[in-house]
């Protein structure tokens, strides 16, 4: 059995396969997933699992170079935003970029995979850009 926090087989496989610059998205329950992009659907019910729990586990395994958020997230300020801001202070998410929610949907077409959570707070979505550990 793995010793690290991440137990989900599909998610572990995707993170292990990421190369420099690949995009992995963590999204709320309402974010559409484009055809052809791998979906790792973790959603069980409203709020389970929540965005922050999934982000924490993903960050335990993934080197992040930068991340992309929607402008709407800054306006609505879901609880996930405070956590992301805290992670930024610790330099765990690299450079931050803001785009419109519609542009985030367009960017999702380039994602290697999208992780759907049970999060129901609007605009709780992030695109993580993979970095390297060397």
From Swiss-Prot:
Name its cellular compartments.
Cytoplasm
This enzyme catalyses: beta-D-ribopyranose = beta-D-ribofuranose
Show which residues constitute the signal peptide. Answer: none
Catalytic residues in the record: 20
Q: What is its main location?
A: cytoplasm
The processes (GO biological process) annotated in the record are: D-ribose catabolic process
Instruction: Please list the residues that bind substrate.
Output: 28, 101, 123-125
Enzyme Commission identifier(s): 5.4.99.62
Give the domain of life.
Answer: Bacteria
Which pathway does it operate in? Answer: Carbohydrate metabolism; D-ribose degradation; D-ribose 5-phosphate from beta-D-ribopyranose: step 1/2
Which UniProt keywords are given for this protein, alphabetically ordered? Answer: Carbohydrate metabolism, Cytoplasm, Isomerase
Keyword Cytoplasm belongs to the record: yes
For this protein, the record's InterPro entries field holds: D-ribose_pyranase, RbsD-like_sf, RbsD_FucU
List the GO cellular component terms: cytosol
GO molecular function ontology, one term from the record? intramolecular lyase activity
What family does the database annotate?
Answer: Belongs to the RbsD / FucU family. RbsD subfamily.
Q: What does this protein do?
A: Catalyzes the interconversion of beta-pyran and beta-furan forms of D-ribose.
Assembly and interaction partners: Homodecamer.
Name recorded for this polypeptide: D-ribose pyranase
**Protein species of origin:** Pseudomonas savastanoi pv. phaseolicola (strain 1448A / Race 6)
């Amino acid at each position: 059995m793995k010793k690290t926090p991440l137990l989900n087989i599909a998610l572990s496989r995707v993170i292990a396969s990421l190369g420099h610059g690949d995009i992995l998205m963590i999204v709320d329950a309402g974010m559409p997933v484009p055809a052809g992009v791998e979906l790792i659907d973790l959603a069980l019910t409203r709020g389970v699992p929540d965005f922050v729990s999934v982000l924490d586990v993903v960050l335990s395994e993934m080197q992040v170079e930068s991340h992309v958020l929607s402008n709407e997230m800054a306006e609505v300020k879901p609880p996930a935003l405070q956590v992301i801001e805290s992670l930024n202070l610790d330099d765990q998410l690299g450079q931050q970029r803001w785009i419109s929610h519609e542009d985030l949907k367009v960017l999702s077409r380039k994602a290697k995979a999208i992780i759907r959570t049970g999060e129901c707070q609007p605009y709780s979505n992030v695109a993580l850009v993979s970095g390297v550990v060397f």
